Amino acid sequence: MLVPKRVKHRREFRGKMRGEAKGGKEVAFGEYGLQATTSHWITNRQIEAARIAMTRYMKRGGKVWIKIFPHKSYTAKAIGVRMGSGKGAPEGWVAPVKRGKVMFEIAGVSEEIAREALRLASHKLPVKCKFVKREAE
């Protein structure tokens, strides 16, 4: 499970998710990628579930790059607690993903296997995704 080693502040503001991703919009390391077409928070558990779905389908073949990291903490108050009395306790970690960001990359497998592996991974994520290929140089 991906979590930061240490953070400066345990509780963060939620922030705004406006516009497109600034960087990481092209396939950089692998041959094929999974690009977000909507913006959302992706938890460390969802990233791990997507990684497992991809690697199980690829059966020890190829290489996977995870290009997002859950660095932002989110908080939640206990069930049945009334409003007020401060911010809730840290609940988990999320990676804010804006539209256009390539989240996962694959190399070393055929296009059919990569397409199916990334399709299986996309079902584990709360964003709409599309399959992208590396640009010819």
Swiss-Prot record:
Keywords: Antibiotic resistance, Ribonucleoprotein, Ribosomal protein, RNA-binding, rRNA-binding, tRNA-binding
rRNA-binding keyword on record: yes
InterPro entries in the cross-refs: Ribosomal_uL16 (IPR047873), Ribosomal_uL16_bact-type (IPR000114), Ribosomal_uL16_CS (IPR020798), Ribosomal_uL16_dom (IPR016180), Ribosomal_uL16_sf (IPR036920)
CDD domains xrefs: Ribosomal_L16_L10e
UniProt keyword annotation of Glycoprotein present: no
Annotated GO CC locations: cytosolic large ribosomal subunit
Effect after changing residue 52 to T: Reduces susceptibility to evernimicin
Effect of residue 52 to R: Susceptible to evernimicin
One of the protein's GO biological processes: translation
Example of a GO MF term: tRNA binding
Family statement drawn from the similarity comment of this UniProt entry: Belongs to the universal ribosomal protein uL16 family.
Alphabetical list of HAMAP family matching this protein: Ribosomal_uL16
Function: Binds 23S rRNA and is also seen to make contacts with the A and possibly P site tRNAs.
Assembly description: Part of the 50S ribosomal subunit.
Protein name as annotated: Large ribosomal subunit protein uL16
Organism the protein comes from: Streptococcus pneumoniae serotype 4 (strain ATCC BAA-334 / TIGR4)
Lineage, uppermost ranks: Bacteria, Bacillati, Bacillota, Bacilli, Lactobacillales
